[in-house]
Protein backbone atom coordinates (compact mmCIF):
# COMPACT_ATOMS: atom_id res chain seq x y z
CA UNK A 1 0.00 0.00 0.00
CA UNK A 2 1.34 3.42 -0.95
CA UNK A 3 0.34 6.02 1.66
CA UNK A 4 -1.00 9.42 0.75
CA UNK A 5 1.44 12.05 1.94
CA UNK A 6 0.71 15.55 3.20
CA UNK A 7 3.01 17.63 0.96
CA UNK A 8 4.83 19.59 3.63
CA UNK A 9 7.89 21.74 2.96
CA UNK A 10 10.15 18.93 4.17
CA UNK A 11 8.42 16.53 1.77
CA UNK A 12 9.05 18.87 -1.16
CA UNK A 13 12.71 19.06 -0.14
CA UNK A 14 12.85 15.26 -0.01
CA UNK A 15 11.36 15.00 -3.51
CA UNK A 16 13.80 17.58 -4.84
CA UNK A 17 16.81 15.74 -3.44
CA UNK A 18 15.66 12.39 -4.79
CA UNK A 19 14.80 13.76 -8.22
CA UNK A 20 18.21 15.39 -8.59
CA UNK A 21 19.47 11.84 -9.08
CA UNK A 22 17.23 11.56 -12.14
CA UNK A 23 18.52 14.87 -13.47
CA UNK A 24 22.09 13.64 -12.95
CA UNK A 25 21.17 10.55 -14.98
CA UNK A 26 20.14 12.74 -17.90
CA UNK A 27 16.34 12.84 -17.87
CA UNK A 28 14.82 15.53 -20.05
CA UNK A 29 11.44 15.81 -18.33
CA UNK A 30 9.82 14.98 -15.00
CA UNK A 31 6.16 14.09 -14.49
CA UNK A 32 4.59 14.56 -11.05
CA UNK A 33 1.58 12.32 -11.35
CA UNK A 34 -1.81 12.96 -9.81
CA UNK A 35 -1.26 15.51 -7.04
CA UNK A 36 -4.41 14.88 -5.06
CA UNK A 37 -6.05 14.46 -1.67
CA UNK A 38 -9.09 12.35 -0.92
CA UNK A 39 -11.91 14.65 0.09
CA UNK A 40 -12.34 12.74 3.35
CA UNK A 41 -8.68 13.25 4.33
CA UNK A 42 -7.29 16.07 6.44
CA UNK A 43 -7.01 14.63 9.94
CA UNK A 44 -3.31 13.84 10.26
CA UNK A 45 -1.00 15.77 12.55
CA UNK A 46 0.93 17.11 9.56
CA UNK A 47 -2.25 18.47 8.00
CA UNK A 48 -3.32 20.05 11.29
CA UNK A 49 0.01 21.88 11.52
CA UNK A 50 -0.30 23.15 7.96
CA UNK A 51 -3.85 24.31 8.70
CA UNK A 52 -2.76 26.35 11.70
CA UNK A 53 0.16 27.90 9.78
CA UNK A 54 -2.01 28.79 6.79
CA UNK A 55 -5.10 30.09 8.59
CA UNK A 56 -3.46 31.32 11.83
CA UNK A 57 -6.18 29.64 13.86
CA UNK A 58 -6.72 26.24 15.50
CA UNK A 59 -7.50 23.32 13.17
CA UNK A 60 -11.17 22.49 12.71
CA UNK A 61 -12.39 19.08 11.51
CA UNK A 62 -13.91 19.42 8.07
CA UNK A 63 -16.98 17.34 8.96
CA UNK A 64 -18.13 19.92 11.52
CA UNK A 65 -19.27 22.64 9.10
CA UNK A 66 -19.32 23.72 5.47
CA UNK A 67 -16.88 26.50 6.31
CA UNK A 68 -14.39 24.03 7.77
CA UNK A 69 -14.84 21.76 4.76
CA UNK A 70 -14.14 24.63 2.38
CA UNK A 71 -11.05 25.71 4.32
CA UNK A 72 -9.63 22.19 4.33
CA UNK A 73 -10.25 21.79 0.60
CA UNK A 74 -8.64 25.14 -0.15
CA UNK A 75 -5.61 24.18 1.93
CA UNK A 76 -5.25 20.83 0.14
CA UNK A 77 -5.08 22.60 -3.21
CA UNK A 78 -2.58 25.12 -1.87
CA UNK A 79 -0.27 22.47 -0.41
CA UNK A 80 0.12 20.64 -3.70
CA UNK A 81 0.47 23.87 -5.65
CA UNK A 82 3.25 24.94 -3.27
CA UNK A 83 5.02 21.61 -3.59
CA UNK A 84 4.89 21.52 -7.39
CA UNK A 85 6.05 25.14 -7.53
CA UNK A 86 8.99 24.54 -5.18
CA UNK A 87 10.10 21.22 -6.67
CA UNK A 88 9.85 22.26 -10.32
CA UNK A 89 11.64 25.58 -9.76
CA UNK A 90 14.45 23.99 -7.76
CA UNK A 91 15.03 21.18 -10.25
CA UNK A 92 14.94 23.46 -13.27
CA UNK A 93 17.53 25.68 -11.65
CA UNK A 94 19.65 22.65 -10.74
CA UNK A 95 19.58 21.32 -14.32
CA UNK A 96 20.39 24.72 -15.78
CA UNK A 97 23.24 25.57 -13.41
CA UNK A 98 24.91 22.16 -13.34
CA UNK A 99 24.27 20.88 -16.86
CA UNK A 100 23.10 23.93 -18.87
CA UNK A 101 19.96 21.95 -19.70
CA UNK A 102 16.33 23.08 -19.88
CA UNK A 103 14.41 20.55 -17.81
CA UNK A 104 10.70 20.19 -18.57
CA UNK A 105 8.06 19.62 -15.92
CA UNK A 106 4.65 18.03 -16.54
CA UNK A 107 1.61 17.15 -14.41
CA UNK A 108 -0.49 14.11 -15.34
CA UNK A 109 -3.93 14.61 -13.79
CA UNK A 110 -7.55 13.54 -14.03
CA UNK A 111 -10.23 16.01 -15.04
CA UNK A 112 -12.04 18.12 -12.47
CA UNK A 113 -15.25 16.43 -13.60
CA UNK A 114 -13.89 13.04 -12.56
CA UNK A 115 -12.38 14.36 -9.35
CA UNK A 116 -15.80 15.69 -8.40
CA UNK A 117 -17.39 12.31 -9.06
CA UNK A 118 -14.73 10.42 -7.12
CA UNK A 119 -14.59 12.97 -4.28
CA UNK A 120 -10.93 13.87 -4.74
CA UNK A 121 -9.39 17.28 -4.12
CA UNK A 122 -6.94 18.51 -6.77
CA UNK A 123 -4.92 21.71 -7.27
CA UNK A 124 -5.75 21.59 -10.98
CA UNK A 125 -7.21 25.08 -11.19
CA UNK A 126 -4.04 26.44 -9.57
CA UNK A 127 -1.58 24.76 -11.93
CA UNK A 128 -1.94 27.39 -14.62
CA UNK A 129 -0.39 29.96 -12.27
CA UNK A 130 2.83 27.96 -11.75
CA UNK A 131 5.31 29.33 -14.31
CA UNK A 132 7.63 26.31 -14.18
CA UNK A 133 4.97 23.81 -15.31
CA UNK A 134 5.36 23.06 -19.02
CA UNK A 135 2.22 21.03 -19.61
CA UNK A 136 -0.11 18.22 -18.61
CA UNK A 137 -1.36 14.76 -19.45
CA UNK A 138 -5.15 14.49 -19.36
CA UNK A 139 -5.66 11.16 -17.65
CA UNK A 140 -9.00 10.23 -19.11
CA UNK A 141 -9.89 6.66 -20.00
CA UNK A 142 -12.64 4.08 -19.57
CA UNK A 143 -12.07 3.98 -15.83
CA UNK A 144 -13.02 7.65 -15.43
CA UNK A 145 -15.47 8.04 -18.29
CA UNK A 146 -17.64 5.00 -17.57
CA UNK A 147 -18.51 6.47 -14.17
CA UNK A 148 -22.30 6.60 -14.18
CA UNK A 149 -24.04 9.96 -13.98
CA UNK A 150 -27.54 11.41 -14.13
CA UNK A 151 -29.04 12.99 -17.24
CA UNK A 152 -32.75 13.74 -17.58
CA UNK A 153 -33.36 11.69 -14.46
CA UNK A 154 -31.60 8.57 -15.75
CA UNK A 155 -28.53 7.24 -13.95
CA UNK A 156 -26.26 5.17 -16.21
CA UNK A 157 -22.85 4.90 -17.88
CA UNK A 158 -22.26 7.40 -20.68
CA UNK A 159 -18.67 6.74 -21.65
CA UNK A 160 -18.53 8.78 -24.85
CA UNK A 161 -20.41 11.79 -23.52
CA UNK A 162 -18.45 11.88 -20.26
CA UNK A 163 -15.10 11.46 -22.03
CA UNK A 164 -15.96 14.28 -24.42
CA UNK A 165 -16.68 16.60 -21.50
CA UNK A 166 -13.57 15.48 -19.61
CA UNK A 167 -11.24 16.12 -22.54
CA UNK A 168 -12.98 19.44 -23.12
CA UNK A 169 -12.36 20.56 -19.56
CA UNK A 170 -8.70 19.56 -19.71
CA UNK A 171 -7.87 21.46 -22.89
CA UNK A 172 -8.74 24.68 -21.08
CA UNK A 173 -5.59 24.28 -18.97
CA UNK A 174 -3.37 25.10 -21.95
CA UNK A 175 -5.50 27.44 -24.03
CA UNK A 176 -3.52 30.60 -24.74
CA UNK A 177 -0.57 29.52 -22.58
CA UNK A 178 1.82 27.88 -25.04
CA UNK A 179 1.95 24.81 -22.83
CA UNK A 180 1.48 21.29 -24.15
CA UNK A 181 -1.35 18.89 -23.40
CA UNK A 182 -1.35 15.17 -24.06
CA UNK A 183 -4.61 13.24 -24.13
CA UNK A 184 -4.33 9.79 -22.59
CA UNK A 185 -5.72 6.86 -24.61
CA UNK A 186 -5.78 3.60 -22.66
CA UNK A 187 -7.30 0.44 -24.20
CA UNK A 188 -8.27 -0.92 -20.79
CA UNK A 189 -8.84 0.27 -17.24
CA UNK A 190 -7.66 -0.59 -13.74
CA UNK A 191 -10.39 -3.14 -13.06
CA UNK A 192 -9.61 -6.51 -14.68
CA UNK A 193 -13.16 -7.81 -14.17
CA UNK A 194 -14.66 -6.83 -17.53
CA UNK A 195 -14.58 -8.73 -20.81
CA UNK A 196 -12.25 -7.66 -23.57
CA UNK A 197 -15.29 -6.78 -25.68
CA UNK A 198 -16.32 -4.32 -22.98
CA UNK A 199 -12.86 -2.73 -22.88
CA UNK A 200 -12.82 -2.37 -26.67
CA UNK A 201 -16.35 -0.94 -26.75
CA UNK A 202 -15.45 1.79 -24.26
CA UNK A 203 -11.95 2.39 -25.61
CA UNK A 204 -13.34 3.29 -29.01
CA UNK A 205 -15.65 5.81 -27.39
CA UNK A 206 -12.95 7.53 -25.36
CA UNK A 207 -10.57 7.58 -28.34
CA UNK A 208 -13.18 9.17 -30.61
CA UNK A 209 -14.07 11.70 -27.90
CA UNK A 210 -10.42 12.75 -27.66
CA UNK A 211 -10.22 13.31 -31.43
CA UNK A 212 -13.11 15.77 -31.35
CA UNK A 213 -10.95 18.46 -29.73
CA UNK A 214 -8.75 19.59 -32.65
CA UNK A 215 -6.68 22.06 -30.62
CA UNK A 216 -4.95 19.11 -28.91
CA UNK A 217 -2.96 16.76 -31.14
CA UNK A 218 -0.56 14.97 -28.81
CA UNK A 219 -1.51 11.62 -27.30
CA UNK A 220 -0.18 9.14 -24.76
CA UNK A 221 -1.12 5.78 -26.28
CA UNK A 222 -1.35 2.62 -24.18
CA UNK A 223 0.49 3.83 -21.05
CA UNK A 224 0.68 0.34 -19.53
CA UNK A 225 1.32 -2.00 -22.49
CA UNK A 226 2.07 -4.98 -20.25
CA UNK A 227 -1.56 -4.96 -19.16
CA UNK A 228 -2.62 -5.27 -22.78
CA UNK A 229 -0.06 -7.60 -24.31
CA UNK A 230 1.06 -10.05 -21.62
CA UNK A 231 -2.28 -11.75 -20.98
CA UNK A 232 -3.13 -10.51 -17.49
CA UNK A 233 -6.36 -8.79 -18.46
CA UNK A 234 -9.17 -9.75 -18.17
CA UNK A 235 -8.71 -12.29 -15.41
CA UNK A 236 -11.28 -14.76 -16.68
CA UNK A 237 -9.99 -14.90 -20.28
CA UNK A 238 -6.61 -16.67 -19.97
CA UNK A 239 -5.97 -16.65 -23.74
CA UNK A 240 -6.51 -12.92 -24.03
CA UNK A 241 -2.88 -12.27 -25.04
CA UNK A 242 -3.37 -14.30 -28.20
CA UNK A 243 -6.63 -12.56 -28.95
CA UNK A 244 -5.26 -9.04 -28.74
CA UNK A 245 -1.84 -9.64 -30.20
CA UNK A 246 -2.54 -7.17 -33.02
CA UNK A 247 -5.86 -5.63 -32.04
CA UNK A 248 -4.45 -2.46 -30.54
CA UNK A 249 -0.97 -2.18 -32.00
CA UNK A 250 -0.13 1.09 -33.70
CA UNK A 251 0.89 1.22 -37.35
CA UNK A 252 4.57 0.51 -37.99
CA UNK A 253 4.81 2.75 -41.06
Residue ranges and their predicted role:
Residues 1-169:
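Polysaccharide-binding and catalytic clefts of secreted carbohydrate-active enzymes
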Residues 101-253:
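Hydrophobic targeting/anchoring helices
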Amino acid sequence: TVPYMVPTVSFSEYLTDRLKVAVDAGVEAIHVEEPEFWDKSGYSEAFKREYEIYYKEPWKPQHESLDAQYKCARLKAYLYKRTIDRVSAALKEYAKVKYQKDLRFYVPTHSLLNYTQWKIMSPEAELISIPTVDGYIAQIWTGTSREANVYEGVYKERTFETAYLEYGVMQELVKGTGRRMWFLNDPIEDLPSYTWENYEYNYRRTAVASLLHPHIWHYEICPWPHRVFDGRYPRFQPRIAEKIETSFETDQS
